[in-house]
């Protein structure tokens, strides 16, 4: 039976990002109707971690909004990592905090963070069409820094931004050059506050994207993330094909600013597809 890895996200700092990423409701340029707060209370994050472990998940990603890591964010994430690891839950801790240099990433590694998530999002050629406040090259360098720091790299992208198939191939080729241990696959969902006017991908096209990702990243853990609920709706037959086509990890529960599936029901559905829950990240 195929094993599936479960991961969950905690949006530990939300909103008021000065970047203008056209796909993100956390950008202050778009005025999305989202919750905004500076830092989530440590006790709340610990409760989330314990609940996640009870569900059988292995990965826990701590996400902060904003362009990059700074001293305050570094100290906050390090404090959370130490507190979670003290609980001995056996969770694989991932930080996702934007652009970061080598010294910052080494600091997080020493504090107990295991991996760093920084998505390329799309191709180098298409990126300027969805963001003008930082470059694709900056993203790529941060990914390289994570590897140099001895962290696991989690890096992927978004499909359905009006990019071409050539853009998809270019992004996947760039990701392959980084050899990430995990590649999140997101599907863009249209939102009236966002400037991207793109229709939601069909389930068939989304599955083609997964097949393409598997071709370029045969050894990466392919993790279906944002957009799964909308693209596949209640079409169990099509959703089950995700795992036949190469997906072997799932984001459980809510995303940064959008609702996901109810975790317990989602796990029941995954088990009905003949999948088993992985018990180790290795």
Swiss-Prot record:
NCBIfam families found in the cross-reference section: bioB, PRK08508.1
Highest taxon in the source lineage: Bacteria
Pathway assignment: Cofactor biosynthesis; biotin biosynthesis; biotin from 7,8-diaminononanoate: step 2/2
SMART domains attached to this UniProt entry: BATS, Elp3
Domain Radical SAM core residue range list: 1-228
Cofactor note: Binds 1 [4Fe-4S] cluster. The cluster is coordinated with 3 cysteines and an exchangeable S-adenosyl-L-methionine. Binds 1 [2Fe-2S] cluster. The cluster is coordinated with 3 cysteines and 1 arginine.
Name of the featured protein: Biotin synthase
Role of this protein: Catalyzes the conversion of dethiobiotin (DTB) to biotin by the insertion of a sulfur atom into dethiobiotin via a radical-based mechanism.
Pfam family, one: BATS
Recorded family membership: Belongs to the radical SAM superfamily. Biotin synthase family.
Keyword list, A-Z: 2Fe-2S, 4Fe-4S, Biotin biosynthesis, Iron, Iron-sulfur, Metal-binding, S-adenosyl-L-methionine, Transferase
Enzyme class: transferase
Gene Ontology terms: biological process: biotin biosynthetic process
Obligatory cofactor(s): [4Fe-4S] cluster; [2Fe-2S] cluster
PANTHER family: BIOTIN SYNTHASE, BIOTIN SYNTHASE, MITOCHONDRIAL
Binding site for [2Fe-2S] cluster: 61, 96, 154, 221
Subunit structure: Homodimer.
Organism: Helicobacter pylori (strain P12)
EC number: 2.8.1.6
InterPro entries noted in UniProt: Aldolase_TIM, BATS_dom, Biotin_synth/BioAB, Biotin_synthase, Elp3/MiaA/NifB-like_rSAM, rSAM
Gene from which this protein is expressed: bioB
């Amino acid at each position: 039976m195929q094993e599936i890895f479960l991961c969950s996200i905690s949006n530990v700092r939300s909103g008021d990002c000065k970047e203008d990423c056209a796909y993100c409701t956390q950008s202050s340029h778009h005025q999305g109707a989202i919750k905004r707060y500076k830092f989530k209370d440590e006790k709340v994050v610990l409760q989330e971690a314990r609940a996640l472990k009870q569900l059988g998940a292995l990965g826990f990603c701590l996400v902060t909004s904003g362009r990059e890591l700074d001293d305050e964010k570094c100290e906050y994430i390090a404090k959370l990592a130490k507190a979670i690891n003290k609980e001995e839950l056996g969770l694989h801790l991932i930080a996702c905090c934007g652009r970061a240099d080598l010294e910052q990433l080494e600091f997080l590694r020493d504090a107990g963070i295991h991996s760093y998530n920084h998505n390329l999002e799309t191709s180098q050629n298409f990126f300027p069409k969805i963001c003008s406040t930082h470059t694709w090259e900056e993203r790529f360098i941060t990914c390289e820094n994570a590897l140099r720091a001895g962290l696991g790299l989690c890096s992927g992208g978004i499909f359905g931004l009006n990019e071409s198939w050539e853009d998809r191939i270019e992004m996947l080729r760039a990701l392959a050059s980084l050899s990430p241990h995990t590649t999140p696959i997101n599907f863009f969902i249209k939102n009236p506050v966002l400037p991207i006017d793109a229709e939601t991908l069909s389930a068939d096209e989304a599955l083609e994207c997964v097949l393409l990702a598997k071709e370029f990243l045969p050894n990466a853990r392919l993790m279906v993330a944002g957009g799964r609920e909308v693209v596949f709706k209640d079409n169990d037959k099509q959703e089950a094909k995700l795992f036949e086509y190469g997906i072997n990890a799932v984001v459980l529960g809510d995303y940064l600013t959008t609702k996901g599936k109810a975790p317990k029901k989602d796990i029941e559905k995954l088990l009905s597809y003949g999948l088993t829950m992985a018990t180790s990240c290795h």
